[in-house]
């Protein structure tokens, strides 16, 4: 095996571990050793942490997905990024779906996504992100109140079709294992609505609420901005 092949293998494992983490609770992979995530001790390996490639990496997550404000389990509560903290239950978010390793086709069979979304994304893995502070399940998931440009991510009832289902678009993943996360309620399949970290949120120092924005490709159809590329990890901060 060549040295270049040896370097590629850990990256490939990292990509596979990332998508597995987001679609089903899993243990720490050999793809990125020495890293853990931001679930509370009560949630431990049952929870996931989504992080932005703009602000962190698999070696240092820094900021992770969380319920903002007072962390109350209420419809419309904003969802964004907080500094990773194992004692913060607002960072306890569980992956959920009709089946382990659910695909968009599985969500379609459950009546949770449209036929159009299934036609375009049916083979891709998908997930709901259920809010579970201290490992206590709520009936609220990360979603959108409406599907439009710059709509903030908020808690929505998990039984709402489309807007609470997220497609893990690994066909656009980077070699380092970061990928876009597309909302299944999108109707523009060339530039679908995806998780986005607004630059003004980072610059202002305010809570980092995530938004839905059309995918913004750079020089070619396969290059995305770091603000629309995400990683995921399972477990508890040491």
Description of each model-found segment:
Residues 1-38:
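Secretory targeting and sorting signals
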Residues 79, 152-157, 213-215:
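Aromatic-rich beta-strand patches that line glycan-recognition/binding surfaces
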């Amino acid at each position: 095996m060549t040295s270049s092949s040896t370097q590629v293998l850990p990256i490939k494992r990292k990509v596979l571990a990332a998508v597995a983490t987001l679609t089903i609770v899993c243990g720490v992979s050999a793809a990125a050793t020495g890293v853990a995530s931001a679930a509370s001790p009560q949630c431990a390996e049952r929870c996931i942490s989504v992080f932005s490639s703009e602000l962190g990496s698999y070696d240092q997550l820094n900021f992770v997905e969380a319920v903002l404000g007072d962390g109350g389990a209420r419809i419309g509560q904003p969802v964004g990024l907080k500094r990773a903290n194992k004692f913060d239950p607002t960072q306890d978010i569980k992956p959920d779906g009709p089946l382990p390793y659910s695909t968009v086709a599985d969500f379609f069979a459950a009546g949770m996504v449209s036929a159009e979304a299934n036609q375009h994304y049916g083979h891709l893995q998908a997930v709901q992100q259920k809010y579970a502070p201290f490992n206590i399940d709520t009936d609220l998931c990360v979603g959108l109140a409406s599907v439009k440009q710059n709509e903030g991510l908020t808690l929505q009832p998990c039984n709402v079709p489309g807007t609470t289902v997220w497609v893990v678009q690994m066909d656009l993943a980077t070699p380092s294992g970061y990928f876009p996360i597309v909302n299944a309620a999108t109707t523009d399949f060339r530039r679908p609505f995806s998780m986005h970290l607004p630059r003004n949120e980072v610059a202002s120092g305010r809570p980092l609420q995530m938004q839905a924005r059309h995918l913004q490709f750079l020089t070619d159809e396969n290059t995305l901005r770091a603000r629309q590329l995400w990683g995921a990890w399972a477990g508890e901060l040491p």
